[in-house]
């Protein structure tokens, strides 16, 4: 619609992907303005699920998530990696925290020490239970699907089977509100919204 002249402007999250933004940045026909970040993209872990109730599993996933690669490879650097939920510019949020470093070897070691041993099919197991985690994403979001597929591949290297499920937006939101997920994408807008 923008390219056909049917609309004058695109604004907001999930309205346009990083590929299109980069295309428009190089175009003489369009002007692109990017604001400072006002939200934080996140993946919420449901700690009431059997597997994710284990702190060591959650920490291992943190170490197995290469936020810089997601920033560079999916967002072309347009979205920077976040190490905290709120920006340091939010009152009382400018605190010293040591972020989890990307380290697949450490992630595997943490899982080994927590009793999650590599089983058949390169999926870890503990007490006969495979390390299967479901990630729910909004099927309308190309970005969320790309991140989900990247994480699925990355987690596979440490023996975690990440099953990704795209759902239309209303179903996605209903399942998120009901807690029917292991992992789910969300956005934190900061004050005054959160």
Give residue spans per PLM region.
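Ligand/substrate-recognition segments at binding pockets and active sites
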Residues: 1, 117-190
């Amino acid at each position: 619609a923008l390219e056909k002249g049917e609309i004058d402007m695109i604004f907001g999250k999930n309205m346009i992907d990083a590929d299109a933004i980069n295309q428009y940045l190089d175009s003489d026909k369009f002007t692109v303005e990017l604001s400072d970040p006002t939200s934080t993209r996140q993946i919420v872990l449901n700690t009431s699920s059997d597997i994710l109730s284990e702190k060591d599993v959650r920490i291992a996933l943190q170490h197995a998530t290469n936020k810089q690669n997601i920033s560079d490879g999916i967002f072309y650097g347009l979205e920077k990696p976040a190490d905290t939920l709120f920006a340091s510019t939010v009152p009382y949020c400018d605190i010293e925290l040591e972020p989890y470093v990307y380290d697949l070897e450490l992630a595997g070691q943490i899982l080994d020490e927590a009793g999650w041993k590599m089983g058949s099919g390169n999926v870890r197991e503990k007490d006969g239970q495979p390390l299967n985690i479901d990630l729910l994403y909004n099927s309308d979001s190309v970005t969320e699907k790309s991140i989900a597929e990247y994480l699925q591949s990355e987690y596979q290297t440490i023996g975690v089977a990440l099953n990704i499920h795209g759902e239309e937006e209303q179903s996605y939101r209903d399942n998120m509100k009901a807690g029917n997920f292991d992992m789910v994408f969300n956005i934190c807008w900061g004050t005054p919204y959160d």
